């Protein structure tokens, strides 16, 4: 699986839709397979995020004895990942995310970086290069 440009715990800005302009922390990132080929391999996959306090939906839930009361609860709904932008922790602006590979000695590190301020956001992966 490819590295994610938006991860759990990131602060994002909603850039499209009814909730446009709202900010929040990413609670969950997941994907849904929309279509599969004849062998059962995913062909069309959509990525979604759940953002804290954004796209609140009402759910009608039945009571479960000893666990919860029944009634109407409010919870966050999914937003397509293309409708949110990461807010850079360094410059505090909404930005696109890129990946940068840095080789230091025999270690190869992959970073996410802000395309506005060109600063590293966080380390994605680290590999030790054999021989060479």
Curated annotation (Swiss-Prot):
Gene3D superfamilies per UniProt: 2.30.30.30
SUPFAM superfamilies: Translation proteins SH3-like domain
GO CC term, one of those recorded: cytosolic large ribosomal subunit
Entry keywords, A to Z: Ribonucleoprotein, Ribosomal protein, RNA-binding, rRNA-binding
Annotated GO MF terms: rRNA binding; structural constituent of ribosome
Pfam family, one: ribosomal_L24
Gene Ontology BP terms: translation
Top-level taxon in the UniProt lineage: Bacteria
Key word rRNA-binding present: yes
Known partners and oligomeric status: Part of the 50S ribosomal subunit.
PANTHER family per UniProt: MITOCHONDRIAL RIBOSOMAL PROTEIN L24
Role summary: One of two assembly initiator proteins, it binds directly to the 5'-end of the 23S rRNA, where it nucleates assembly of the 50S subunit. One of the proteins that surrounds the polypeptide exit tunnel on the outside of the subunit.
Family: Belongs to the universal ribosomal protein uL24 family.
UniProt-recorded name of the protein: Large ribosomal subunit protein uL24
Gene source species: Aquifex aeolicus (strain VF5)
